[in-house]
């Protein structure tokens, strides 16, 4: 298996501190039959941006839902392994309990309430908050500071806003819960490149200024590795490679199979021989 570093070395590479979030050898089964994750392990240090990369169907979204405990709504279950946040087991907590601990997920597809205004959507993120009204208004102003476009669209029905504005609304809604860890699923999906850059710049600002940690699942490997500190690559429900984002971006296998580049120049996925990749990585 080609690696940049081993998973066990990941905390040392990204941070000397103990991992903020630790996923340890988890297996996930849907409908008591379909094995989707096959021993996935990863770590997110406090204050880091970690990218979870891979093709569609590799297991990225399932990994995030395992952490946020949204699997049960889809008849899925973690049947092996543990998940720890701040040193405590969280794999059997409810989603509400995880939100109160500081873990929020922004799901793939944005999932805004189309019949509510942008501001009403944002306010739903404060539903579990024990903050006072003045504190909630301050949180709302903080969201508008990072997403000034949402201030302009605050009275518009979310269903009539653009895909980029809906993605911003979904992230802003998560911020209203005052998270210390955000699980961000496919933030670039269906968005124009300029909007993708804008959203990732905001993720960077939230990370550097607010110390919010991010675990983001993303198919856009090029953008994700530019903004992340560390990365894991999933293939068929397994972690096949991990390392510092800067090192992954220079790895020849990653260049060929995920960035569309090789020593011969840019290549398409159609031209790549995927069976060789699987044989090399999963042997």
Model-predicted segments: where are they?
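Conserved ABC ATPase signature
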Residues: 157-161, 165
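The feature captures the beta-strand-to-loop junction immediately N-terminal to the Walker
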Residues: 53-55
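Conserved ABC transporter NBD signature motif
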Residues: 78-88, 135-140
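ABC ATPase nucleotide-binding domains
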Residues: 260-283
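Helical segment within the ABC ATPase nucleotide-binding domain
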Residues: 197-211
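ABC ATPase signature
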Residues: 116, 160-161, 174-175
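A short, proline-enriched helix->beta-strand linker immediately N-terminal to the Walker B motif
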Residues: 176-180
